[in-house]
Amino acid sequence: MSIYTNILTKQGLYSIIKAREVNDMNKEQTDLFLEDILEFGKQYVATGAQVKRVEDSMINLCKIYGFEDAEIYAITTLIIATIKNKDGEHFTQSVRVTKSGTDLGRLEEINEVYKYICSAKPDLEELDRIIKHPKKTKPKPFFKLIGYMLAAGSFAIFFGGNLRDGLAAAVVGIFIYLMDYHFRLKKINNIVYTLTASFFAGALAIISTYFGLGENIDKIMIGDIMLFIPGLLLVNSVQEMFNKDIVAGLYKLIEALFTATAIAGGYALSMILLGGMLK
């Protein structure tokens, strides 16, 4: 149980209305507060959260600190925020979101921080600290590797493969994990990464069948393809458009379509270049 959960347990979650009060921040403090709110939103968007949820959370945080008039506009790559202080002055800042993906663990941590801020309403110094220097759970590469292997092997068997196909898909899953880890560190373009990784995954599946590790090349490929499928991204894009966030929804939809095209292109290229090994 983290420090935020402990505080929530002791104090309870106060309502936002009760926490509102006229803010007494000066200009420099208001600029810092807005900077912190934008950083919070940036971290939120980077986890794959819906932009509607991000906007609502940021507006609520502004109201908690006395900024009743707050306008937030967020898309997958940009957040713009405007607030008005007690003297009627408007403050506007924006932040570019360069990182994107799906990280449910980090999303849960951010939700916990959000609840803590709503409950305790920390001073500006503490707010700046907990947002800009968050406590992150250490990644566990071994468990992630096991997840890749289990997912690839299980899907290969689920779609009609035998145990040998599942084992071959799991072995290829190890290489997919290693490629994913390496390319993510290099911050390579996601479409280029998907195309490259799909090609090598397809090539490894063909090689595994050629040497007798696997039996049905199509089942092995299907199992490994499932590691690349942008299913959550596609679902979120449709949900964003239903929430009338057309720009954010279209951005995610186009990204999902390009990713799917890269997957198909990578596997097709491996079949064209190495397909002769199957004869």
Give the positions of each predicted feature.
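Core alpha-helical transmembrane segments of integral membrane proteins
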Residues: 137-211
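Alpha-helical transmembrane segments and their cytosolic membrane-interface
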Residues: 99-165, 255-264, 275
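Soluble N-terminal domains of membrane-associated systems
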Residues: 1-122
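Generic detector of multi-pass transmembrane helix bundles and their immediately adjacent loops
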Residues: 210-279
